Amino acid sequence: MSYNRLGDPYGDDRDARSPIMNPSSLSNRSPSPGRPLDGYQLSDAPYGHHHHIEMPSSDRLAEQPTYSVERIPQSYGHNEAYEAQHQHYPGYEYSVDPEAHHDAYYTQPYQPTVTPGHDDYDLGQYPGHQHSYQDDEPILQPEDPFQAQNPYSDDYQEDMTIAPTPSPAPLRRWKTVKEVQLFQGNLVLDCPIAPKLLNQIPHAENGQRDEFTHMRYSAATCDPKDFFEERFTLRQKLFAKPRHTELFIVVTMYNEDDFLFARTMVGVFKNIEHMCSRTRSKTWGKDAWKKIVVCVISDGRAKINPRTRAVLAGLGCYQDGIAKQQVNGKDVTAHIYEYTTQVGMELKGNQVHLKPRSGVPVQMIFCLKEKNQKKINSHRWFFQAFGRVLDPNICVLLDAGTQPGKDSIYRLWKAFDVEPMCGGACGEIKVMLDHGKKLFNPLVAGQNFEYKLSNILDKPLESAFGFISVLPGAFSAYRYIALQNDKNGQGPLERYFLGEKMHGANAGIFTANMYLAEDRILCFEIVTKRNCRWLLQYVKSSTGETDVPDQMAEFILQRRRWLNGSFFAAVYAITHFYQLWRSDHSFIRKFMLLIETIYQTINMLFAWFGIGNFFLVFHILTTYLGDADLLGTAGKVLGVVFEWLYLATLVTCFVLSLGNRPGGSNKLYMTMVYLWVFIMIYLAFAAVFVTVRSIQEEVKDGSFTFSTLFTNSTFFSIIVSLGSTYVMWFIASIIFMDPWHMFTCFIQYILLTPTYINVLNIYAFCNTHDITWGTKGDDKAEKLPSANLKPGGKVDVNIPQDDGDLNAQYEAELMKFAQKPPKEIKTISEEERQADYYKGFRSSVVLVWVFCNFALGAVVLSSAGLDRFSDDAEAAETDRNNRAMIYMAVVLWSVAGLSIFKFLGAMWFLVVRMFRGV
């Protein structure tokens, strides 16, 4: 695609200034095999005499043998002359160094000839368009009524917002067939952006071309790992002076709506503005945006939300109608759109509004994957394909919906700048509370407390050791070089990308579950990387806000993946702790990491025995209440009732987890949550009551001292252990100057603790066979046209080209998100509804059957707490034996009676048969 200015770059004296006719003109070219020390600067003399905006020579896009989509009947920048001059090009040994290809990009301009019958449109009806067939004149003329308004003229009226307006006329030429040349078998197009957008942003004038006037489309027909070898490249490497990428930001998304996507992009744009405002920085400053590339990767063309795609089109990063299904018989695996946008965004209510010229430019790459292949595959495109081309310093990972703080990305980058051995870092993930309104939902409040506790206690502890068990994929950063594999192809990325293949029939169930938390594997591999000493750090000043589930069914499904993935990944890390010794860490650091491994092992053991530990604490505390000094008989009755309620709820959890979908049994799951809350209230009452009574007993003796409390086993076991934990939480929160969650969310978290321990853990372990990410299979996307190779190495493409068509298309995209989004209505198919009904009936029958048999055994044996009602142990034992003997006699005589009844019936049958004879 040609990035040279429109028109003849050599003016009238073509032969004298052409790099082919006059080799001396090559003195300003960029390093290449022939001239490794020369710079590269395009001639800046377009047709006619026009005034130019100042543009640094380093920001001029170098010529390249790809094709501009313009309002001319033939492709621009390449023809048979290119083939004649570069016959050797396809066959020589391809260099993996992008700088080696500048010679190929330096070509003479193409002088097109009209192909009869190629374009059936009569341009005579459009004033000023007759010159479209004259390549000696610029396409955009001052007198052209269809041209974009000059934003630098006195008559220009700046419009700070893009308001969708109806198209003033029907489409004139929606799609035109154009013939273009493949470059090294790859289809790459330069597409002009809609004049409606171009009018509102600064750009090169007088027909010149820059990164603001055209969007670059590449149809990738290869696997991500082959992107570089297949000779694909990105815009940053095509400037006269290739740009260095200091910060490479990826936003991965599945089917998030426009609001969630815009929320993330608003945060990213603010961070880029912040770095551009740091004028005293040696790295950043006014042109900091040139060192930052933002990559948006959507997982599946059929999955992307249409409103989100429309927002990308509004930014200039997407155009409908140019993507291809196949190129030269090869299936397209990803559609790559590149554009430097100057359109900002703001959120008003739940709507997205675009604001042109509202901020600094942002270099965007939008990668729309053809198929839904999960998040790890998206990261393969980011690291293996784009990362290898750009060779960035720091990579930042974001999920669509996570909003980084206004300087959070800079804070993450600063951690790497300060600590050379920092291989990865993460910030604080905050729960989006909508100014506190969402705290009225106990589930959200409980998660907010959990997140805060993790950011105050867990992450700082792990950061102090140098190994954070998980850098959340929703907001984290890595040093690109720390991720790279060694010369044998082994390393962090190799282990990380194995997870893409761990969801098929050949994957081991342990490994498949482990890769549900693939970011934990990546963290472990970075710290234990052979002959390296990378560390992981937590950056408290860097924050990112995200939504959390506000419905129990959604919450259970999310935690199923988290718990299973984290558990099996922790087992992997613990059992492979010996890999620490292959790293180049100091002995002290290895010793510290070994201590952290022991700490994580203890944590894992507590998680494994969590259900049993919680029941034992409940049983012991509620049994105390039955003492004569406490509640006496009332305590015994309450203890038995609540113990039966506890066990019944626990069994229900198992039955539902083994066969019922949370979304289809929401009422049953919510009933269990309420029962666990009720049980927790009683447990808290028991703890407080037992503690208060023990203190009262000590005071009553008259010899009470403060040290006496610690000699009281009941007080010491309950208060010192639990109280010190809660007090420690409060003190740590105050020290971190973030104590408000202790006042707004503490009670909700305590009440939901049994739900975390029982419901979530039971569902997770009962569904270890489910290794999906909670997403369904592929939907069939609309089939796209193919680009088939013709004689001469050319293909036909159908593309919108006319200004009116481009504007109408752009306005149509704006209209998609101009209206308020329709209220999302979750529908359940009849098949799912019927299946949920059958499963619910099955579970109800199983529960009734189990509870009836349990009750029978408990009553007969006086077990499950019934034995507490007798104060005389010997009498209780005698009574239990008597009841057992009576039950035994009833059962045995019942069996005998039934057998006799059957025998009599059989005899009667024989008697009747004797008289009937049949």
UniProtKB/Swiss-Prot annotation:
It is found in: Cell membrane; Cell septum; Cell tip. Its main location: membrane. It is a multi-pass membrane protein. Residues 22-37 have a biased composition (Low complexity). GO terms for molecular function: chitin synthase activity. Coiled coil: none annotated. It catalyses: [(1->4)-N-acetyl-beta-D-glucosaminyl](n) + UDP-N-acetyl-alpha-D-glucosamine = [(1->4)-N-acetyl-beta-D-glucosaminyl](n+1) + UDP + H(+). Induction: Expressed moderately during sexual development as well as during the early phase of vegetative growth, but expressed weakly in old vegetative mycelia and in asexual structures. Expression is stimulated by osmostress. Expression is poritively regulated by the transcription factor abaA that binds tightly to all three AREs (AbaA response elements) in the chsC promoter region. GO terms for cellular component: cell periphery; cell septum; hyphal tip; plasma membrane. The chain crosses the membrane at residues 562-581, 605-625, 637-657, 672-692, 715-735, 845-865, 890-910. Disruption phenotype: Does not affect morphology in the asexual cycle nor growth rate. Exhibits growth defects on media supplemented with sodium dodecyl sulfate (SDS), high concentration of salts, chitin-binding dyes, or chitin synthase competitive inhibitors, when chsA is also deleted. InterPro entries: Chitin_synth (IPR004835), Chitin_synth_fun (IPR004834), Chitin_synth_N (IPR013616), Nucleotide-diphossugar_trans (IPR029044). Glycans are attached at N712. Residues 1-63 are annotated as: Disordered. Its EC number is 2.4.1.16. It holds the Pfam family Chitin_synth_1N. Mainly expressed in hyphae and conidiphores. Relatively strongly expressed in young cleistothecia and in mature ascospores, but negligible in Huelle cells. Keywords: Cell membrane, Cell wall biogenesis/degradation, Glycoprotein, Glycosyltransferase, Membrane, Transferase, Transmembrane, Transmembrane helix. Polymerizes chitin, a structural polymer of the cell wall and septum, by transferring the sugar moiety of UDP-GlcNAc to the non-reducing end of the growing chitin polymer. ChsC and chsA share critical functions in hyphal wall integrity and differentiation. ChsA and chsC share also overlapping roles in septum formation. Belongs to the chitin synthase family. Class I subfamily. This is Chitin synthase C. The lineage of its organism: Eukaryota, Fungi, Dikarya, Ascomycota, Pezizomycotina.
